[in-house]
């Protein structure tokens, strides 16, 4: 057999797209009959209803609309999913980076362990500490070594070396 890994989608968006397809079929039954009962609907129209996968753990879909459309059109491709983060300002110019959403199917404990290993191996020179302050919501606190570190540069480094960015 053939293996597949289809990302999760929003059920409401899928239902809206199906209703639209049914409406198109009702409006022109003769044309629908000529196409074997399947109405011809442009990909761009369907993308208005289904803009992309909807991951239950959140995260940011880091793909262009064109890449998503191509993956849907061909049935091939993958999506880059990144953790969502925000920069929390502290006093005296200090800041922490707070990860609030994880990529789909990434285990938080393994991610923390991997970041700790990289810190021990001195492969993350700009990161001083990582703390898991999660309760019901995800809250990973990344503490930079100094306030001169660019938070976006630090996150890019983490995206490259850890599962804070994955391909699905």
Q: Which ranges hold each PLM region?
A:
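Intrinsically disordered, low-complexity regulatory segments
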Residues: 2-168
């Amino acid at each position: 057999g053939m293996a597949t890994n289809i990302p999760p989608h929003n059920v409401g968006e899928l239902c809206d797209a199906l209703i639209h397809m049914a409406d198109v079929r009702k409006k022109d039954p003769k044309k629908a009959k000529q196409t074997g009962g399947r109405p011809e609907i442009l990909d761009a129209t369907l993308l208005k209803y289904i803009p992309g996968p909807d991951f239950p753990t959140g995260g940011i879909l880091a793909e262009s609309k064109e890449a998503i459309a191509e993956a849907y059109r061909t049935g091939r491709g993958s999506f880059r999913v990144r953790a969502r983060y925000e920069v929390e300002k502290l006093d005296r110019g200090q800041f922490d980076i707070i990860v609030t959403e994880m990529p789909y199917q990434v285990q938080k404990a393994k991610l923390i362990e991997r970041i700790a290993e990289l810190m021990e191996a001195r492969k993350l020179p700009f990161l001083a500490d990582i703390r898991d302050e999660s309760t019901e919501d995800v809250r990973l606190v990344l503490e930079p070594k100094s306030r001169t570190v660019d938070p976006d540069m630090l996150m890019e480094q983490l995206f490259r070396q850890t599962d804070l960015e994955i391909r699905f």
